[in-house]
């Protein structure tokens, strides 16, 4: 494993640890999820470029599309929770039952 892969893997692990440690606020959870998606995108792009996988060159773009959808849904949920309850605590999400 080269240093590039080790650093990207370390960024993913740090984002995962941040998600597990700072899960009380929705905004910090969303930022950690975005960090995880960004490190996955960079890891996939570097792997595809190093191994010359021409057939899998669209895979990082598809991952970015899913990351953008996840960010849009997360931010809309954040706006809804903060407008309704005034805070962005994750524990307020249990109250959003229909």
From Swiss-Prot:
Core subunit of the mitochondrial membrane respiratory chain NADH dehydrogenase (Complex I) which catalyzes electron transfer from NADH through the respiratory chain, using ubiquinone as an electron acceptor. Part of the enzyme membrane arm which is embedded in the lipid bilayer and involved in proton translocation. Belongs to the complex I subunit 4L family. This is NADH-ubiquinone oxidoreductase chain 4L. Its EC number is 7.1.1.2. The chain crosses the membrane at residues 1-21, 29-49, 61-81. It is an enzyme of class 7 (translocase). Keywords: Electron transport, Membrane, Mitochondrion, Mitochondrion inner membrane, NAD, Respiratory chain, Translocase, Transmembrane, Transmembrane helix, Transport, Ubiquinone. It comes from Mirounga leonina. It comes from the Eukaryota. InterPro entries: NADH_UbQ_OxRdtase_chain4L/K, NUOK/Mnh_C1-like. It catalyses: a ubiquinone + NADH + 5 H(+)(in) = a ubiquinol + NAD(+) + 4 H(+)(out). The keyword Transcription regulation does not apply. GO terms for cellular component: mitochondrial inner membrane; respiratory chain complex I.
């Amino acid at each position: 494993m080269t240093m590039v892969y080790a650093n990207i893997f370390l960024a993913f692990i740090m984002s995962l640890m941040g998600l597990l440690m700072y899960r009380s606020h929705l905004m910090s959870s969303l930022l950690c999820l975005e960090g995880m998606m960004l490190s996955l995108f960079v890891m996939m792009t570097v792997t595809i470029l190093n191994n010359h996988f021409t057939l899998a060159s669209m895979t990082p773009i598809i991952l970015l599309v899913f990351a953008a959808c996840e960010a849009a849904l997360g931010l809309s949920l954040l706006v809804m929770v903060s407008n309704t309850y005034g805070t962005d605590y994750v524990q307020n999400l249990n109250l959003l039952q229909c």
